[in-house]
């Protein structure tokens, strides 16, 4: 990202020349306006380069994983230059869904049955045109887990698939029950504490391609689900490695942060309505278990979880559910290489709840902590339409594990 610093310096020089020209033609009428603008520009550039653009903090449980990442995933040690005009966490979080492009992806849908009679929708990108891995049986496979109400249509998922396509890999997106347009066959949705559906999907995908390198990447709640699975199963998983992005490590801390007035207004209430809309489509399936009218009156994610999610999955209290849903305590039991990217200004995942000390005790875990980036933001460049810092971390890490993962054995 040294190029961005050079671009900023070049932009500053061009701005100076432009403003000097405007003074000559009388646009400002005097040199006072020019001096003010130049002074502000220089001060802002200095502040940005000295206080905003920083290298991420890399926390690992051992020298081996740290050296591996420095050698094969150097992006985690490079300076991250957030978008110069939108670097604050909330701004990045709000902007990303609207400004990032959506690369076209043609999916092949598959519905698989579950033990309780339900069904799960998987969206496959087979990448049969791969020239790097022409044999489908050994083509690396990446399982992607979207966020809370996300599907295979999310821009961050599409970008991961686009980058995987460049590497010659195959992708499959795990859509949680009832969110991708498929019928809900049983009165059950999903939560990040219950890993049964994920276990079903992992077993199914691995059975189709047992000889292919198999990795997973989870975003936000998808990352929480993935970490909870890995913490429960340890090394007894067909996955060779995993990556998570913008995970909420402690559900209590996440909820408390999102219930602050500004965060509630910007994020919490909207996501609550999304959750309500998702379950209301299948209202007839839940009327015997929960008071749907009461659920639809929830004003926060915590209220929704108390009235719906915790009840659906048999928890006695919301505190019991949130304790079980938090991946932080299970991090010590993760048995495969996992890279976790978080921003310390993410209001969905407060920095004080990031399990730094726990990560230091597990040689399989690496935390990459940026100073800015928000929640699934990580925008960079002057006009951040294309890939983000998160995308670059994803691409370098999965490629490193596929091509050099044996070095960690």
Swiss-Prot record:
InterPro entries: AB_hydrolase_1, AB_hydrolase_4_CS, AB_hydrolase_4_sf, AB_hydrolase_fold, ABHD4. One of its GO terms (cellular component) is plasma membrane. GO terms for biological process: medium-chain fatty acid biosynthetic process; medium-chain fatty acid catabolic process; phosphatidylcholine biosynthetic process; phosphatidylcholine metabolic process. The keyword Membrane applies. The chain crosses the membrane at residues 26-46. Keywords: Hydrolase, Lipid metabolism, Membrane, Phospholipid metabolism, Serine esterase, Signal-anchor, Transmembrane, Transmembrane helix. The keyword Lipid metabolism applies. One of its GO terms (molecular function) is acetylesterase activity. It is found in: Membrane. Its main location: membrane. The active site is at residues 220, 346, 375. Its EC number is 3.1.1.32, 3.1.1.4. Residues 140-233 form the AB hydrolase-1 domain. It is a single-pass type II membrane protein. PANTHER family: ABHYDROLASE DOMAIN-CONTAINING PROTEIN (PTHR10794), PHOSPHOLIPASE ABHD3 (PTHR10794:SF50). Phospholipase that may play a role in phospholipids remodeling. May selectively cleave myristate (C14)-containing phosphatidylcholines through its predominant phospholipase 1 activity, cleaving preferentially acyl groups in sn1 position. In parallel, may have a minor phospholipase 2 activity acting on acyl groups in position sn2. In addition to (C14)-containing phosphatidylcholines, may also act on other medium-chain-containing and oxidatively truncated phospholipids. Belongs to the AB hydrolase superfamily. AB hydrolase 4 family. This is Phospholipase ABHD3. It comes from Homo sapiens (Human). The gene is ABHD3.
């Amino acid at each position: 990202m040294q190029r961005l610093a050079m671009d900023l310096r070049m932009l500053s020089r061009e701005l100076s020349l432009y403003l000097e020209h405007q003074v000559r033609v009388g646009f400002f009428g005097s040199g006072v306006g020019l001096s003010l603008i130049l002074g502000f520009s220089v001060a802002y550039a200095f502040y940005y380069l000295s206080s905003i653009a920083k290298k991420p903090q890399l926390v690992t449980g051992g020298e081996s994983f740290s050296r591996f990442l420095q050698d094969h995933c150097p992006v985690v040690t490079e300076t991250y230059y957030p978008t110069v005009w939108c670097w604050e966490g909330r701004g990045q979080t709000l902007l990303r869904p609207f400004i990032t492009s959506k690369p076209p992806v043609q999916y092949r849908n598959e519905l698989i049955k579950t033990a309780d009679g339900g069904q799960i929708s998987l969206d496959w990108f087979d990448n049969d045109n791969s020239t790097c891995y022409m044999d489908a049986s050994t083509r690396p496979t990446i399982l992607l887990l979207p966020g809370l109400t996300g599907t295979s249509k999310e821009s961050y998922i599409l970008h991961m698939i686009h980058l995987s396509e460049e590497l010659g890999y195959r992708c499959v997106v795990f859509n949680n029950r009832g969110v991708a347009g498929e019928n809900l066959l049983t009165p059950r949705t999903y939560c990040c504490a219950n890993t049964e559906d994920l276990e079903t999907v992992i077993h199914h995908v691995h059975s189709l391609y047992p000889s292919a390198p198999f990795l997973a990447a989870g975003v936000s709640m998808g990352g929480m689900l993935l970490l909870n699975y890995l913490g429960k199963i340890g090394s007894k998983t067909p996955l060779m490695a995993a990556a998570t992005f913008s995970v909420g490590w402690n559900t209590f801390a996440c909820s408390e942060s999102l219930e602050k007035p500004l965060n509630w207004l910007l994020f919490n209430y909207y996501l609550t309505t999304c959750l309500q809309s998702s379950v209301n489509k299948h209202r007839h399936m839940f009327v015997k278990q929960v008071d749907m009218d009461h659920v639809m009156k929830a004003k926060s994610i915590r209220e929704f979880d108390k009235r719906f999610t915790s009840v659906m999955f048999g928890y006695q209290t919301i505190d019991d559910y949130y304790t079980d849903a938090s991946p932080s305590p299970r991090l010590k039991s993760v048995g495969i290489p996992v890279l976790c990217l978080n921003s310390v200004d993410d209001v969905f995942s407060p920095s004080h709840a990031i399990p730094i000390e726990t990560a230091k005790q597990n040689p399989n875990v690496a935390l990459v902590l940026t100073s800015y980036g928000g929640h699934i933001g990580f925008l960079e460049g002057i006009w951040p339409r294309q890939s983000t810092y998160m995308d670059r971390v994803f691409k370098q890490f999965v490629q490193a594990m596929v091509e050099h993962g044996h070095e960690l054995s």
